[in-house]
Regions:
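Amide-donor transfer/coupling interface in amidating biosynthetic enzymes
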Residues: 2, 24-44, 69-182
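Short glycine-/acidic-enriched loop or helix-start segments at secondary-structure transitions
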Residues: 10-13, 56-59, 138
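Ubiquitous "structural anchor" signal
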Residues: 12-13, 22, 40, 60
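Glycine/small-residue-rich loop that forms an oxyanion/phosphate-binding "nest" at active or ligand-binding sites
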Residues: 13-29
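Catalytic nucleophile loop
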Residues: 37-63
Length: 182
């Protein structure tokens, strides 16, 4: 599981820091890159949450919008200046594994991010998008379970029961996978 956190250095997706990528941690970037490369090679299940989804995309060859408000001016608000959640709707793709977990269609999710997928990594597909087109979930169809979600399911377990299903699906696939040599 790759969790939320600080921004990823734009160096990893061959862009200059526009000044909007902030609080970068080179050690975290390097360690998550190595973890993702190993897990993808060995087909070890991955659940990327918020920064974790962005790391999946970047370290598999994609890129990021460094700051949604200044680069896109999106219709949806995806973050606030404090730790209070912003909520918006996403549309889950029928063909994605996320639709099997949460159900196809529209779902309300929390949002704490100011960055988002710009160029999708090769081999990945979009699992969900916000109404403004911002990518909210990605997956790798050629792997057993590689799913990235932009929201934090752990923060709204009680309010949004579907969030429990995401964590449960990841635990189940990891349990089924535990006998494999890592």
């Amino acid at each position: 599981m790759l969790t939320g956190g600080v921004d990823i250095s734009p160096d990893y997706y061959h862009e200059k820091n526009t000044g909007k990528s902030r609080s970068i941690c080179p050690l975290l970037d390097k360690s998550e890159k190595l973890l993702i490369e190993h897990a993808m090679k060995k087909d070890i299940p991955i659940l990327g949450i918020c920064r974790g989804m962005q790391a999946l995309n970047v370290f598999c060859g994609g890129s990021l919008i460094q700051d949604i408000p200044s680069e896109i001016g999106a219709a949806e608000i995806h973050s606030s200046e404090n730790e209070n959640a912003v909520f918006h709707n996403i549309q889950i793709s029928k063909s994605s594994p996320l639709s099997k977990i949460m159900g196809f269609g529209s779902h309300r999710v929390n949002s704490y991010h100011h960055q988002a997928v710009k160029k999708l990594a090769s081999g990945f597909s979009i699992a969900a998008s916000a109404t403004d087109g911002i990518v909210e979930a990605i997956f790798c169809p050629s792997k057993k379970f590689v799913l990235g979600i932009q929201w934090h399911p752990e923060r709204d377990i009680d309010a949004v029961p579907e969030n429990t299903k995401i964590i449960s699906a990841f635990i189940k696939i990891c349990t089924d996978n535990e006998r494999r040599t890592i």
